[in-house]
């Protein structure tokens, strides 16, 4: 990992990972393990710390596009690819855990999935979790990028995909890049519009979760559905 000789073996991220486990490593150490190597005059741990400082933490780094990562000093294509796949692997792992399980019996896992999928996004994204009649997860999918509900065709697309999957219910989720989890008037209006469109084909909108950084707000729990 191009770490300096002054760093004792027991202090190196790889050795600490094997000895202590990932939860006890700090962000810079975990990021250094993803990067594997540093650059000239800068070891992997130092490069990781510089990235965290420059972008305000992991969320800022994972919000970068492929092009932005590739142009970061000291990264290049290989390191950029390692960083691009990390949050996606986490999201897919949680999705596999949820598949076939009753979503409403595992609300914390649903929130964790939504946070993993959306918290790092720099612009609004919307995803849907399609459930069967027993509220078991059938599939997850991305629906929209940009301001929620801007396109009038959007509710029809949700209904069409739900029918294709033979879904009986849906959980919707989108993010607020501003960091404010409170639903806007537009969020509430769109939620009602989608709920009514789904009801026409006997599909229930179970919840609409708003993700804002490390928060996940349930509109159903607020009585807004």
Curated annotation (Swiss-Prot):
PANTHER family: DNA REPAIR PROTEIN RADC, UPF0758 PROTEIN YEES-RELATED. It holds the Pfam family UPF0758_N. A motif (JAMM motif) lies at residues 174-187. Zn(2+) binds at residues 174, 176, 187. Coiled coil: none annotated. One of its GO terms (molecular function) is metal ion binding. The keyword Lipid biosynthesis does not apply. The keyword Cell cycle does not apply. CDD domains: MPN_DUF2466. This is UPF0758 protein BAV2405. Belongs to the UPF0758 family. Keywords: Hydrolase, Metal-binding, Metalloprotease, Protease, Zinc. GO terms for biological process: proteolysis. InterPro entries: MPN, RadC_JAB, RuvA_2-like, UPF0758, UPF0758_CS, UPF0758_N. Residues 103-225 form the MPN domain. It comes from the Bacteria.
């Amino acid at each position: 990992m191009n770490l300096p000789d002054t760093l004792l073996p027991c202090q190196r991220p790889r050795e600490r990972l094997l000895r202590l486990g990932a939860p006890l490593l700090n962000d810079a150490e975990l990021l250094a393990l993803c990067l594997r190597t540093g650059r000239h005059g800068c070891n992997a741990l130092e490069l990781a710390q510089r990235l965290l400082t420059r972008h305000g933490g992991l969320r800022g780094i994972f919000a970068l596009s492929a092009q932005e990562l590739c142009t970061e000093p000291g990264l290049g294509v290989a390191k950029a690819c390692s960083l691009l796949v990390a949050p996606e692997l986490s999201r897919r792992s949680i999705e596999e855990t949820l598949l076939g399980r009753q979503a409403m019996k595992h609300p914390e896992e649903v929130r964790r999935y939504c946070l993993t999928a959306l918290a790092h996004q720099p612009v609004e994204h919307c995803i849907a979790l399609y459930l069967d009649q027993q509220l078991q997860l059938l599939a997850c999918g991305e629906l929209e990028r940009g301001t929620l509900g801007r396109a009038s065709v959007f509710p029809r697309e949700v209904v069409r995909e739900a029918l294709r999957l033979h879904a009986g219910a849906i959980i919707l989720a989108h993010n607020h890049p501003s960091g404010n989890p409170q639903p806007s008037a537009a969020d509430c209006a769109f939620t009602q519009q989608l709920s009514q469109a789904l009801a026409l084909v006997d599909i229930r909108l179970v919840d609409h979760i708003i993700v804002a950084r490390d928060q996940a707000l349930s509109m159903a729990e607020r009585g807004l559905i």
